Structure formats: C-alpha cells, structure tokens
Amino acid sequence: MEKSNNLDESYIKNLKSKVWELLKKGEVEEADKIFSTELDIHEIMGTWNWLHKILIEPEDTNPISIEYLIKKGVNPILKDEYNMAPLNWAMGNGKNIEAAKILLKAGGDPNLADKGVREIPLYKVCYMKPFNKELLELFLAYGGDIYKEYKRYGTAILGKNLYEHIQNNRLALFKDTGEYLFEYNKDIEKYGKDYFINKHKSLLKDEADSLLHEAVIDFDILKIKKLLDEGYDKNIKNFLNYTPLVKAFSICRLENLQAMVEISDLLYAGTTDSIKAFIIRLDEWLDEYSKF
C-alpha cells in the first residue's frame, strides 16, 4: 500500500510539472483538461497557489495563463510566506509587464511590501528603464501610493516614502520618474488626492465591463440603483469573470469604504471566495491604518 502511495505521489508530481510547463507557455486548453480531471486548480502548495508558482520566473510566463487562472477563480491577491502576492512576483525586476497589468486589474495591491520591504510593485515600476509612463499611470490609477510609509529593516533608504526616496536619490535611473512624480505631487497638493484618479478613471475600465461595472468604478450609488431598477443583472461578469460587486471590491480603497458598504447591500448575491479574499484584505488595511 505504501508503494502505491509513493507511485501516486510521483505521478502527481510529474503531472504538476507538466501543467507548470503548459501554463508557462500559455497552453491553457491542455492544462485545463488536466485540471478538469486530475488536479485541483485551487490547491495551495505550501503558501503558493498556481499564480505564484508560474510567476517564480516571471519573464517567460505567458500572460494568457494569468488571465485563465484568475477566470477560474484562483486567488490573485493571496500572500505567501514572504508576504508576496502574485503581482509582487510578476514585477520582480519589472520582468512581466503584461502579467502585471492583468493582476493589477484583478485587484493586485501595488503597494504591498514583502517581509524585507524590497519587493514593492510600485517601486519596481519606478525603477524600470526605460521609464514606462503608461504603466506608472496605470499603477497610480489602481491605488499606487507614493506617500505610503514602510517600516524598513537593514540597509537604510533615503526618504520615508517612495516620493521622497526618488527625489532624494538623484540618480540618472530616476530622472524621468522623478520629474513625472514631481508634477504628480504638485497636482495632488493643488487639487487633492482624487484629482489623478478622476483624471485617469478610464484606466479602470475594460471593454468587457457592463454599465453596472462602470457604475461601481465611479462608486455611483444612484446610477447603480437606477440600473438595477431597469433590470440589469447584478451577476453579469466581465473579462476576468468578476461580477460588479467583485469589481468594486477589487478597486476599493479605505476612502471608498462607506460607498462600498452601500454597494454591497445593493449587489450582494452570496459570498464567493473572491469576495472573502478582498474583505480579508480590507480588514488588514484597516488594522494597518489604525496603527498610524
């Protein structure tokens, strides 16, 4: 019996290696056949899910597989033993921009720091060379916070936050980023924190988003009520298989909490794993916020 178990373990191990290779190459149809019959796509392996696993070497991971796994309900914001979510792995040295974009739109936290406070997705965007203005604007639109402070250990870094860090480290690497963030900071000081998000709100929208998805992007309670009164389906899904409620959770920040409560009351149709994951994250943010 023990020999049989060992054979089973070896078979499963080889099967996982095969699926890993298929996902790395974007051969999702073949991978799906195996997940449908022999492997659990939602399995947690140690502290990793399949998104973590295929992003260990991010540069050669096909973004099609990232989208496939998210559509299948694999948690895109799960933190591993290093306090890293899939977005952190995707942005390791800025190696997989397309995968990062998908994970960001799936709710990835651009400000999440690993335990060593070295692998922060937003920082990685700012370190990229050549400067990628489009990607930086996308990260800022999805909640990237250049003023967020981190408790650092080990080597000291000039500046208490990303903005100060880049302004104080006057390196050629940061020239374009520094100039962009300097103007960004001026706009925030002049017009307020919501100015940039409102200016670039179109970045939060996708072609497959319904009118109801677009209404939650604006956290527009009156429009949501109107659409529901007109018979819009609260369970309609976008390209990531996100309902309007899950979409709202994925872009929600602490400043939207009151509106989020109202949206939940209007759109709630049963708790899903995605909703649970985002609620846990909001609880963590509230706990972190209360310490300052």
Roles of regions detected by a PLM:
Residues 1-38, 42-59, 67, 171, ...:
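Intrinsically disordered, low-complexity regulatory segments in ankyrin-centric signaling systems
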Residues 12, 27-28, 40-44, 59-62, ...:
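Alpha-helix initiation and capping sites
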Residues 12-19, 43-56, 79-86, 113-126, ...:
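Ankyrin-repeat boundary/"N-cap" motif
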Residues 21-26, 53-61, 89-96, 124-131, ...:
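Ankyrin repeat A-helix N-terminal signature
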Residues 30, 65, 98-99, 134-135, ...:
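Conserved ankyrin/ankyrin-like repeat signature
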Residues 35-40, 67-75, 101-109, 137-145, ...:
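Ankyrin repeat domain, specifically the short helix-to-loop turn at the C-terminus of the second helix
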Residues 116-141, 145-148, 235-260:
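Ankyrin-repeat and related helical/solenoid repeat scaffolds used for protein-protein interactions
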Residues 146-191, 245, 249, 257, ...:
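Leucine-rich solenoid repeat scaffolds
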